[in-house]
């Protein structure tokens, strides 16, 4: 394993595989904050050159957090398909990149190979790809998952309807939900971040969203994004009724601990929701991630934030989720500084999620102190649509009045669908057409008019 190279008369040498991964990463303010980023463009190029010549085996044998010390590492390593791994372990990262991008390599071939790749290897492949590579490769991979409906079928761009409310008010949540439905959002999930993380609040919102779904016979799934332990306690109660179990996850055991979560807890939640939940299909978990969360809890172990993010996906695939999405700008400019970094992180995350075999979505968002704006979000949303992202977020005017950040709007989702000739999930599309919200591949005559729910 060679960890040095010569470039323009200068020798660049790296301490270990973790250092190569970090120095090969595209510029991120979080990596600079952590002191692991490349010190120059030439050093970054040199690291990419070294990384490209490492093998799949080199990456597996050198996880960024030791196997003996970390439950996330153990899950990633133990889930590897040894037969597939034996076939590709001698391939270099550069060879894997070229093979994935080859026109003769289809989704089925990539998905089989992915079972032999650790999260570090997947991160490595992404680090030597340009943005166009990430878009092209991401769009080649087709992954489906089923809760009440199936996400990931051909030419579908789904949307999470996010009807958040500052006090979890039933009337406000209902109004926002009906408006979002009238614009065609909500086929991925109707999912609310509660302002109050209690069992009673979770039960109340489950009932509110469930009543709307049942009253109007909407083919979708609902979710309340309270802590996993809150959801489990709520589901065990007599009033408990849910489709999906949500939890934010991270790429190390220590970072999970900062969220109040363990891998055993996630296994318990998956089993409970399969037993007592109302999902018709086998995929009952919903995970959110985001570059920088491990660093923010001092649990990155000297690794770069994109490699740690990839490890989130290695953890996620263990639980066969229905939905996974990166909340790409939510951590703020301390981790993702500006639009350039936001674009790169979004494309990296969707590609790495897909190469893990996940139905990958993205919350294209930013905090109010980032040097970016809605025009940038709309551009990124369009890029992700071409990259095959499974779903994005639909919020009223792209403004979350509870979490106080900016995302993408109901109108944005409809526009990208029309532009790229994408459709909602088929059963949901049929439901929209019945109500006049969707016609001939775009918004219909009743779009944006939730009053029709009270006149039929």
Q: Which role does the model predict for each range below?
A:
Residues 66-72, 141-165, 284-298, 360-362:
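N-terminal small/glycine-rich loop or linker at the start of catalytic domains
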Residues 233-383, 387, 392-396, 400, ...:
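Catalytic alpha/beta core domains of metabolic enzymes, predominantly
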Residues 1-141:
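Long, compositionally biased, glycine/small-hydrophobic-enriched stretches that function as flexible linkers
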Residues 149-245:
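Glycine- and small hydrophobic-enriched segments that form the cores of compact globular domains
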Residues 112-118, 122-130, 189-206, 327-340, ...:
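Glycine-rich, proline-tolerant flexible connector loops at the mouths of alpha/beta enzymes
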């Amino acid at each position: 394993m060679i960890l040095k190279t010569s470039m323009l008369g200068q020798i660049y040498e790296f301490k270990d595989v973790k250092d190569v991964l970090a120095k090969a990463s595209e510029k991120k303010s979080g990596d600079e904050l952590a002191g692991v980023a490349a010190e120059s463009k030439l050093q970054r190029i040199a690291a990419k050159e070294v990384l490209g010549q490492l093998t799949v085996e080199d990456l597996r044998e050198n996880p960024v957090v030791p196997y003996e010390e970390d439950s996330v590492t153990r899950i990633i390593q133990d889930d590897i398909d040894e037969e597939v791994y034996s076939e590709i372990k001698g391939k270099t990262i550069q060879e894997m990149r070229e093979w994935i991008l080859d026109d003769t390599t289809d989704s089925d071939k990539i998905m089989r190979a992915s079972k032999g790749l650790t999260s570090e290897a997947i991160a490595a492949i992404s680090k030597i790809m340009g943005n166009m590579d990430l878009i092209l490769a991401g769009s080649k991979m087709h992954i489906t998952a089923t809760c009440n409906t199936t996400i990931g079928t051909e030419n579908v761009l789904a949307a999470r309807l996010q009807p958040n409310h500052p006090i979890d008010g039933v009337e406000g949540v209902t109004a926002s939900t009906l408006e979002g439905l009238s614009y065609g959002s909500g086929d991925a999930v109707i999912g609310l971040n509660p302002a109050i993380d209690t069992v009673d609040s979770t039960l109340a919102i489950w009932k509110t969203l469930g009543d709307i779904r049942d009253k109007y016979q909407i083919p979708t799934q609902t979710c309340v994004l309270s802590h996993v332990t809150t959801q489990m306690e709520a589901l065990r109660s007599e009033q408990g009724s849910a489709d999906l179990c949500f939890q934010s996850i991270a790429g190390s055991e220590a970072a999970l601990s900062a969220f109040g979560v363990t891998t055993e807890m996630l296994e318990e939640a998956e089993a409970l929701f399969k037993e007592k939940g109302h999902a018709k299909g086998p995929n009952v978990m919903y995970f959110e991630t985001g570059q920088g969360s491990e660093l923010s809890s001092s649990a990155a172990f000297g690794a770069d934030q994109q490699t740690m993010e990839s490890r989130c996906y290695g953890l996620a695939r263990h639980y066969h989720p229905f939905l996974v999405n990166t909340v790409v700008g939510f951590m703020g400019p301390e981790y993702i500084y500006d639009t350039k970094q936001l674009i790169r992180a979004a494309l990296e995350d969707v590609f790495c999620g897909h190469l893990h075999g996940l139905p990958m979505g993205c919350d294209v968002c930013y905090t109010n102190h980032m040097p970016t704006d809605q025009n940038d979000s709309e551009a990124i949303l369009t890029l992700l649509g071409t990259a095959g992202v499974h779903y994005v977020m639909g919020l009223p005017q792209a403004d979350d009045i509870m979490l106080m950040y900016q995302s993408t709007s109901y109108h944005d989702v409809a526009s990208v669908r029309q532009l790229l000739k994408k459709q909602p999930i088929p059963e949901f599309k049929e439901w929209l057409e019945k109500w006049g919200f969707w016609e001939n591949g775009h918004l219909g005559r009743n779009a944006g008019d939730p009053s029709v729910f009270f006149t039929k």
